[in-house]
Amino acid sequence: GPVLNPEDAQILERMLRTARSVTVRERSSLAWCRERGIDARLSVDDATDYPVASPARTLHYAEGVSAGQALDELPEHYVCVTVNECTDQQAQQIARLLDGMWREHGYAPVFLSHYGDPQDPASGDIQAHQRIAKRLRTSTPATLLPILHADQSIAVHRAAAFTLTSRYHPAVFSAAAGIPVLALVPDAFTQMRVGGALRQYGLGEFTLPLGMLAGGVPELMVAAALRHAAVASDARRTELLEVLRAERAYLLTQILASGAEKLDEVEAPAPFPTVEQVPALPEPLGATVRAARELFTETSLTAGFEWAMSDRAHSWDAEHRRQLECARAIGGYSAHGAEQTRPVTVEAYSEAPAEAHPAQPGLLARVARRLRG
């Protein structure tokens, strides 16, 4: 998701209907399931209470790359930054925001990659981080970290004073630890996931499309997030951890139960507790940003759907060409050097019966037929 063409939606629905238990991470997914009569429950991401090993596990890096020294020298107060993509203009705007956080709050930017290759230090999020870092003022100290093992990554997030991210799990780790978060959203997919995760904590308003970095809005949202974190208790976080543990216990009971009668005896967890959302901006600015966010999400979904349909068409076209080439290769040449002509049938994604042909249908065509029952 969130882009599902009709065929994909049918496949997903069949998958969920065959599951013994369905749990989702955000209310948009819950609504999708309930619209189709699927008995789903809402919970939090299973990395919310990720247990860090002791000693923390590490990755195997390419020669000359070491994360240990940088981790030992992290600043006392810092904003943890994870950005996976941005334009040059957005990189400049993010750098300006980070300069302001250093100047006003004393938070030094620490760039933490969540995607990359430990054997290729120039790959992944580090590329966007380098572009942002080189636009910082010379007076703003910055630390660039490579991709880390989850044990180390979570430790960095939990020790931060603030999190600025366009990725999902940095928001999950930080919100679970009570660290204020501002999510910079590049598309509808991220908005649904990150916004859904933050909404569980009452922080769903702290998401901002990357195209809205100008005009002082992100600075206001950072200030609001810090004010809320200064007075917030850990009651909601404790409540969500209890929800997650109850969900796991319920799933385990279902797995161990055998037979319909025993399954009926398993008591489902209590409904997911609701929470009031914390305002991120004063009104009417907050309403304006919400409307812009909704329009951005709708536009991104439309573009994503069109891309998905185009990608699907190209995929089937490539598969048809492959089958045609295989069929021609099977035809081959006769022993006398003359090409043997054989009827060729290309399997299509259609209910129409194929012409009589001794060859077996292509793999994708067989899968499609199986899914259609």
Each language-model region and where it sits:
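Active-site anion-handling motifs in enzyme catalytic cores
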Residues: 1-347, 364-367, 371
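Acidic, proline-/serine-/threonine-rich low-complexity intrinsically disordered repeat tracts
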Residues: 342-360
